[in-house]
């Protein structure tokens, strides 16, 4: 027998469900609940059915891993995640392997309604598709890891990392894991994470994951430089010279190009302002 794509049969979702029922193929989808779901360690995705209407609120029945935020515990839960070279290795001072940590966070986050995502994603072929996700561990770890990077990385490094992250995500989504480009991006990511050591504390409550504490031996944050109290060690006298130097390009531009910038003989700012919207 040959194996081919089911697309060649031109079957609708209902046709596929009926075929599965007639041939005793176990599937979760039913005619009255025709959702297409996928699950793995990292999360659960749901699509099809009423979800194809972008205006329709997802019915509660589509969710299996996460509680409705309204039904989540009133008491928040605090979790500390420790990272070494950007990799989460412990939770609440207990060392865990990756699989155990992710499973634990999925359970903890799901109990508090954390990890529900409803969005339109752009498929490789250009079609927009509405997807519902339940990914508690992913949301918690991403939130915590981002907070750690914000404490250790410089501003420019953070901005560039965002660019690389977008390319990395697209590459994996588009099935190019085994490409040379992926190897290049991996080299950068691994290098960027060599300093990412520290602990982040998050609060899980009613569908939210909020960073409430952070510490790292490699942090660039200095309380003595940032404080507004008498312990302030920043030399405020240095500000005057910095302001003059930093503002010099804008000052020269205003002197040399004032007529154009003021709108005489060139495009006026009013012409690029958005139109006024009438009341609905």
Residues of each region from the PLM?
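Short, small-residue-biased leader/transition segments that mark boundaries at the very start
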Residues: 2-5
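A glycine-rich phosphate-binding loop feature that marks nucleotide/adenosyl-phosphate handling sites
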Residues: 35-39, 119-127
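Basic, glycine-rich polyanion-binding accessory segments appended to enzymes
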Residues: 123-280
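A conserved active-site cap/scaffold subdomain adjacent to cofactor or substrate pockets
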Residues: 66, 71-121
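A conserved mid-domain beta-alpha-beta active-site/ligand-binding segment of alpha/beta enzyme cores
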Residues: 28, 34-86
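Glycine-rich, charged/polar anion/phosphate-binding loops
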Residues: 59-69, 100-104, 111, 128, ...
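Metal-dependent de-N-acetylase/amidase catalytic core
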Residues: 13-25
């Amino acid at each position: 027998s040959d194996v081919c794509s089911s697309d060649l049969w031109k079957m609708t979702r209902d046709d596929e469900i009926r075929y599965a029922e007639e041939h005793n193929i176990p599937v979760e989808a039913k005619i009255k609940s025709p959702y297409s779901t996928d699950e793995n360690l990292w999360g659960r995705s749901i699509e099809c059915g009423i979800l194809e209407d972008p205006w329709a609120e997802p019915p509660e029945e589509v969710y299996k891993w996460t509680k409705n935020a309204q039904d989540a515990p009133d008491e928040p839960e605090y979790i500390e995640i420790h990272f070494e070279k950007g990799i989460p290795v412990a939770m609440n001072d207990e060392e865990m392997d990756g699989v155990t940590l992710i499973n634990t966070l999925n359970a903890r986050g799901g109990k508090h309604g954390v990890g529900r995502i409803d969005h339109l994603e752009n498929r490789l072929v250009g079609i927009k598709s509405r997807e519902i996700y339940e990914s508690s561990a992913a949301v918690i770890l991403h939130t915590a890891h981002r907070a750690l990077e914000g404490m250790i990385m410089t501003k420019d490094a953070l901005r560039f990392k965002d660019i690389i992250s977008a390319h990395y995500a697209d590459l994996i989504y588009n099935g190019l894991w085994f490409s040379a480009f992926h190897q290049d991006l991996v080299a950068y990511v691994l290098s960027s994470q060599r300093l990412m050591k520290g602990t982040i504390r998050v609060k899980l409550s009613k569908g939210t994951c909020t960073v409430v504490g952070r510490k790292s031996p490699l942090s660039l944050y200095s309380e003595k430089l940032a404080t507004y109290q008498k312990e302030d060690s920043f030399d405020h006298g240095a500000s005057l010279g910095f302001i003059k130097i930093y503002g010099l390009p804008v000052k020269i531009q205003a002197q040399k190009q004032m007529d154009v910038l003021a709108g005489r003989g060139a495009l006026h700012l009013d012409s690029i302002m958005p139109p006024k919207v009438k009341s609905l």
